[in-house]
Amino acid sequence: KNFFVNNKRNLIVGFSIILFLIIGYLSLKEIEKREKIKLANQFNSIKINFKVENKQSTIEQLKKLVNQKDATYSPLALYFLIDNKLTDDKNEINILFDELINKTSLDEEIKNLIIYKKALFNSDVITENDLLKILSPIINSDSIWKSHSLYLMAEYFYSKEENQKAKEFFNKIILLPDANNDIIVESKKRLNRDFSE
């Protein structure tokens, strides 16, 4: 009892600080929740109101949404931009990909998916070295997207008629312990059909 009487002031200050921290934390979570709802509404509004006539406005709104660096709606905005072929400017799209990859806080596998999509988006116009550079974070990891990335490289070399390199990548897929089953099947088919001796 004496302890409480003697330290009454310190206990009140300590309790007040703890209460203030709890209220601050809960307030921050509520603000984040409201911001997420706002971004969701903004994205849905862009999708619903999209018309070819207001294409430039849609592009600007989607770019703004990508730059919000939200783990959910920023990638969705970029995918909407690409899927609807709203811009032919590959450089602009690559800048947005880099914004997501380098500046947005993402789950590691979501980040790897975005890297893979960037490589896929660019695969018909870039060099072997550039494609490998984009995909190297995935290829040099245990990502679930590793087999997809190896398959993209194999198909890239196959399309360039660099059959030995293509064969090497198809073989790497087959040897992967956690490779996607469909990709293993396709790789085996390709090896049996086009590379059997």
State what each model feature region is.
Residues 21-41:
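Transmembrane signal-anchor/signal-peptide helices with a preference for the extracytoplasmic
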Residues 36, 55-56, 90-91, 128, ...:
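TPR-repeat structural position
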Residues 33, 52, 87-91, 106, ...:
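Short coil/turn and helix-start
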Residues 78, 85, 96-197:
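Soluble extracytoplasmic domains of inner/organellar membrane proteins
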Residues 55-105:
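Extracytoplasmic/periplasmic/luminal assembly and interaction segments
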Residues 39-57:
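Short extracytoplasmic/periplasmic juxtamembrane "stem" segments immediately C-terminal to an N-terminal membrane anchor
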Residues 1-20:
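N-terminal positive-inside, membrane-proximal cytosolic segments immediately preceding the first
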